[in-house]
Amino acid sequence: MDFVMSCLSVGENGNLSIGGCDVATLAEEYGTPAYIMDEDQIRENCRVYNRAMQEYYGGNGIVLYASKALSCKYIYRMMKEENMGIDVVSGGEMYTALKAGFPAERIYFHGNNKTDDELKMALENGVGRIVVDNVFELESLNRLSGEMGKTADILFRIKPGIDAHTHSFIRTGQIDSKFGVSLENGEAENIIKMADDMENLNVVGVHCHIGSQIFELEPFELAAEKMMTFIADLKDKYDISIKELNLGGGYGIKYTEGDTPIDYDKYIQAVSKV
């Protein structure tokens, strides 16, 4: 039988197994409903990403686990052990990660509706990067950083105007997305110029996210090209140096038998050529 994941199998007794564990036995021991995950598979996925980062970027980068997949202390401890970074989108996820002992400097704080309390929490705990989504958040963060005597390292979420060829419900890189600032109409350029003049902020990089469940390399390559051109323009026009490019988007996985995912490392290889 061709399962959607390699860690699934059917045992001699006809029961489904996950990572070699009989699910009927797990149900008897722990009850149902239950979420069952294969730790070995999760760790191997992390290692595939990290090996690709080492091979194609000489280790000059960081792979981030998306907390929206599952936010709990055990997962965060695994991510720490596998030398991953994480992204969080709420004070709750940030709190859980910190309680798990995850290094604050490897946390990226995303989200398009951060509260002042959440921004303060990030500043107080020395979160590595705050990914700014809009002008209102930018002004709030600059004010709070000044009041607290901090300098925040920030990235901006950019809408690159990319069609990721995925379902409309999970597209995020198009011009009319509710997330981030637009590249096409000059909004992204203007907000970065504004931030560059703010005393309490350090503009480190730019970020984009083009959607989820993407089975093609081309949208990621195109996004990387547009973002690199934007970075070069900022340097040429305003002498603003962008040191980090954070490329986001969900690589396709096999939900159904008809899905044909690309090996994770192929995405990283393709983007590295840009």
Residue ranges and their predicted role:
Residues 71-75, 93-95, 116-118, 160-176, ...:
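Conserved radical SAM core fold
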Residues 1-153, 189, 193, 197-198, ...:
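A charged N-terminal "starter" segment
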Residues 66, 153-159, 207-209, 246-248:
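Short beta-strand segments
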Residues 22-30, 205-211, 248-254:
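A short small-residue
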Residues 158, 163-204, 208, 217-229:
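Active-site/ligand-binding-proximal alpha/beta "capping" segment
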Residues 212-274:
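C-terminal active-site-proximal or functional interface alpha/beta core segments in diverse enzymes
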Residues 39, 43, 116, 135, ...:
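Non-membrane alpha-helical structural segments and their capping/turn regions in soluble enzymes
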Residues 31-35, 124-129, 168-182, 216-221, ...:
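Glycine-rich tight-turn/loop motif centered on a GG-T
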